Amino acid sequence: MNLHEYQAKQLFARYGLPAPVGYACTTPREAEEAASKIGAGPWVVKCQVHAGGRGKAGGVKVVKSKEEIRAFAEHWLGKRLVTYQTDANGQPVNQILVEAATDIDKELYLGAVVDRSSRRVVFMASTEGGVEIEKVAEETPHLIHKIAIDPLAGPMPYQGRELAFKLGLEGKQVQQFTKIFMGLATIFLERDLALIEINPLVITKQGDLICLDGKLGADGNALFRQPDLREMRDQSQEDPREAQAAQWELNYVALDGNIGCMVNGAGLAMGTMDIVKLHGGEPANFLDVGGGATKERVTEAFKIILSDDNVKAVLVNIFGGIVRCDLIADGIIGAVAEVGVNVPVVVRLEGNNAELGAKKLADSGLNIIAAKSLTDAAQQVVAAVEGK
């Protein structure tokens, strides 16, 4: 679950981290009043969406008058912002962040993620702030400095100082950076985050460090013990199909293709998408129904997949282990009949009672194509989309 920039900065303030004074506004009038609260300009106005690249898309602007603030708010509030990180529809702009402008001397980067290979929270810092860290990692990886947090000892001040020295900081900046590092690490651990990022972390003309931007991603599996973060959730920024899937404990990710995929198991789902691509198809989604492929869950999965108007065929790939394939077939038949599926459905069953399951599909009288293998399933679903 992602948070907005203004929400991230609210958390920063609770932990004593320096950030510009700002207010999130939902109307042009509120935006003008926010500027009055902040004081003399210039100000910075920012569209609040769960996506990067806002500046290049016109969603961030430095303004010198309240008239400009009103014009910016009137232009963007209620509209959708399209950036390189969104789809063609963009993300809805429901709030504008108005904050004091900062005199920037230098831009840095500071962030942390859970590194699965080392099984540690790893902090990354770079002198190349203000640009995508992925681009820095690809083109100049030597400019990214990393520190792993020991899960028993926790973050240590000396680690912050070590990163500060590698960034070329000196004097009071080392102390300020160490405080920010310790604060971010505390937020990360106490709030069950999966990602935290300040890009850019700037050095002002006065030589002070300020958190100019903030990006936080919470671990969805830990939200049950983070009630205040749950209240910050903005579902308008989420794909409604993904939100609906989460209610049924289905793992769904929307893609740009036209072949809906329903699979049990994340690894098998990725393999299924790969083989669809191999045979010239384009997956419309990733959907893992998990181990309990019951009729109810399969029905809901079909509804979610078919809510995408681009879907021209559906591939169901189920490996029956503990769950018998004949029971899964019953669920698929019931779901297709209930939902009223009007696109070709190709089903590949493998494992426990697979032959009986395939026979039930063949005898159902519904528009269900039983595949003999995964390759056969991929070829048949691609052919169905192409009308062959």
Swiss-Prot record:
Query: Is this entry keyworded Metal-binding?
Result: yes
Q: Which UniProt keywords apply?
A: ATP-binding, Ligase, Magnesium, Metal-binding, Nucleotide-binding, Tricarboxylic acid cycle
Pathway in which the depicted protein is active = Carbohydrate metabolism; tricarboxylic acid cycle; succinate from succinyl-CoA (ligase route): step 1/1
Residues that coordinate or bind substrate: 264, 321-323
Give an example GO molecular function: ATP binding
Q: What class of enzyme is it?
A: ligase
- Which Enzyme Commission number(s) are listed? 6.2.1.5
* Co-factor note (free text): Binds 1 Mg(2+) ion per subunit.
| Any single GO CC term annotated in Swiss-Prot or TrEMBL for this entry | cytosol
Q: What does this protein do?
A: Succinyl-CoA synthetase functions in the citric acid cycle (TCA), coupling the hydrolysis of succinyl-CoA to the synthesis of either ATP or GTP and thus represents the only step of substrate-level phosphorylation in the TCA. The beta subunit provides nucleotide specificity of the enzyme and binds the substrate succinate, while the binding sites for coenzyme A and phosphate are found in the alpha subunit.
Output this protein's name. Answer: Succinate--CoA ligase [ADP-forming] subunit beta
Q: Which organism is it from?
A: Klebsiella pneumoniae subsp. pneumoniae (strain ATCC 700721 / MGH 78578)
Native organism taxonomy: Bacteria, Pseudomonadati, Pseudomonadota, Gammaproteobacteria, Enterobacterales
Gene designation: sucC
